[in-house]
Amino acid sequence: METVTKNGYQNGSLESLCVNQRDPLSWGVAAEAMKGSHLDEVKRMVADYRKPVVKLGGETLTIAQVASIAGHDTGDVKVELSESARPGVKASSDWVMDSMDKGTDSYGVTTGFGATSHRRTKQGGALQKELIRFLNAGIFGNGTETCHTLPHSATRAAMLVRINTLLQGYSGIRFEILEAITRLLNNNITPCLPLRGTITASGDLVPLSYIAGLLTGRPNSKATGPTGEVLDAAEAFKAAGIESGFFELQPKEGLALVNGTAVGSGLASMVLFETNVLAVLSELLSAIFAEVMNGKPEFTDHLTHKLKHHPGQIEAAAIMEHILDGSAYMKAAKKLHETDPLQKPKQDRYALRTSPQWLGPQIEVIRFSTKSIEREINSVNDNPLIDVSRNKAIHGGNFQGTPIGVSMDNVRLAIASIGKLLFAQFSELVNDFYNNGLPSNLTASRNPSLDYGFKGAEIAMASYCSELQYLANPVTTHVQSAEQHNQDVNSLGLISSRKTAEAVDILKLMSTTFLVALCQAIDLRHLEENLKSAVKNTVSQVSKRVLTTGANGELHPSRFCEKELLKVVDREYVFAYVDDPCSATYPLMQKLRQVFVDHALENGENEKNFSTSVFQKIEAFEEELKALLPKEVESARAAYDSGNSAIDNKIKECRSYPLYKFVREELGTVLLTGEKVQSPGEEFDKVFTAMCQGKIIDPMLECLGEWNGSPLPIC
């Protein structure tokens, strides 16, 4: 099969450039790109992100590679240009110079720009110089408290994407300029670009003009060096090892540099890499939520989701099903539900039970948007396009960044929906009316009156969620006509990308807070199990000692109370009474006493005889219990605090363990209590920083390492 690269100059005929007869509208290519699971796609992204070299040829750049170059500013990931692209780039550059010599009238080469393209000039180089000058209209706010500079990671992403676009040989620019930008990237020299001022149609004119300004040595151009030092253009060139000196732009070259969507699509690529990771994390968090809530795993049953047909939902359910399959928490919950089916509602609430249905559409939106942006960063998106094969310049509008604006608006909606689910789950988790026995606010102190746990975190989560939902409002509905009504519709791609980057940051705050809360809940379930065991053993011990025999050693009717007394211990939530286990106002002692009362009522005539009265045993039982139980509870608590619990933590038997282990052991977070000095925010910061550094990825994928990509069989 013939392949076509670089404007028809290698390995292909002119005819094959025109129409792909097998897939003339490229829908087939788009559909093919969506095959396979989302998780597999995320794994491929991670592999791409970690490659030490990004080789650019114009057509195979991935969003993960863009994110990698953007995020690795220490020189450990390098950019290489494919030499096979050089002939095509040179041919289009030569064509522009030849057409200029012949007097051919071409937009941006011999004409003015935009609404003033009726003007004409033969001074092609001077025209490009003026283009860069008037586009340097950004504001940096130097000396003010507010920063108006684009983050250097986003600038690096833009530089990479612009090189990739120009390598395809349709733009009329010298290969040497692309090599110079590559040198800047590889030496971590980053031009300073304004944060605002682009509508991403005609591309990102204003910010990209500052890259061109640095290349041409404009006196107002600035860059940051490897350690954050501010450099002028000459210092930047020296630091990057560019020995050729500043570029005198030839006709069309200034336009080639600025008339593209690279800033918007570069930032969109960074955003989407993180969004895809956070989408998988949300599936894991939902599964762990089911574990600590004693949820019913049937919500993941494949038949339910197969009948709904949506692939995102099917995959989300299958991933949760895999995590919950064989989970020690699910086994314990199943036993609990079988023993006492009325202890909790028949069905879990929507935030748990419908989490696959909620997350599925968001994952589909994120996947589609990822592919859309990946097409954009491999597109030729300036104007005019130089078609050497037909000896003409084609005037069109590929600079219109609508795929960016629309994709980012849609992704922001998906992010807001994921955040809303996490907030709903978090709200259930910290509320003792809904969390199936966990303490209010997930408090872990001996004295709950001096520990309010995650109350502050819940307020913060409400704040995050509110801001996230506000950010979900579309940017693309706020288009203003620009540039003398020439740019009367425009994409606002970079603005939408920036808002989506904000949304991603907030979702990371929410994911961090929720993950730490889930680890707190896991530890509380562990503590709960050990405390309940201590209570149960003590009640059993006291029952045998006090209730088995009467005053004369004869068997006493109250001995039959023990079974029901132990059932009370099983049924009562430990954290509802454990701070003062023998208090008559707490449910444990009240329910234990009720057992005696019920048996006394059934004891008939024997109850009238002091020696066989069940009721008469209440005082002795309670006095013995009050003497022993507080000590046993404290002993169990002390053993837990010292890491010597009688019962091990169930999480170690679960597929979600790698994530818990990462948070607790690698990051060194602890069980939060009012008895310790650590604030919740200190622990959140540890996890948030690790999440921003990408350290969450490996433990997250380790949780899913055994998944074969399919739901469990329906049987």
UniProtKB/Swiss-Prot annotation:
The record's section on CDD domains has:
PAL-HAL (cd00332)
On the tree of life, the source organism's domain of life is Eukaryota
Post-translational note: Contains an active site 4-methylidene-imidazol-5-one (MIO), which is formed autocatalytically by cyclization and dehydration of residues Ala-Ser-Gly.
Please cite one Gene Ontology biological process associated with this protein. Answer: cinnamic acid biosynthetic process
The reaction(s) catalysed by this protein are: L-phenylalanine = (E)-cinnamate + NH4(+)
* Modification sites for 2,3-didehydroalanine (Ser): 202
Where does the record say this protein resides?
Answer: Cytoplasm
Q: Which residues bind (E)-cinnamate?
A: 259, 347, 353, 383, 455, 483, 486
Q: Name one GO cellular component term.
A: cytoplasm
| InterPro entries (alphabetical) | Aromatic_Lyase (IPR001106), Fumarase/histidase_N (IPR024083), L-Aspartase-like (IPR008948), Phe/His_NH3-lyase_AS (IPR022313), Phe_NH3-lyase (IPR005922), Phe_NH3-lyase_shielding_dom_sf (IPR023144)
Give yes or no: UniProt keyword Transferase.
no
- Give the top-level enzyme category: lyase
One molecular function GO term is:
phenylalanine ammonia-lyase activity
Q: Name one Pfam family in it.
A: Lyase_aromatic
- Annotated EC: 4.3.1.24
Catalytic residue list: 107 (proton donor/acceptor)
Q: In which pathway does it act?
A: Phenylpropanoid metabolism; trans-cinnamate biosynthesis; trans-cinnamate from L-phenylalanine: step 1/1
The UniProt record lists the 5-imidazolinone (Ala-Gly) crosslink at 201-203
Cross-referenced NCBIfam families, in alphabetical order?
Answer: phe_am_lyase
Q: Which PANTHER family match?
A: HISTIDINE AMMONIA-LYASE
The entry's protein name is Phenylalanine ammonia-lyase
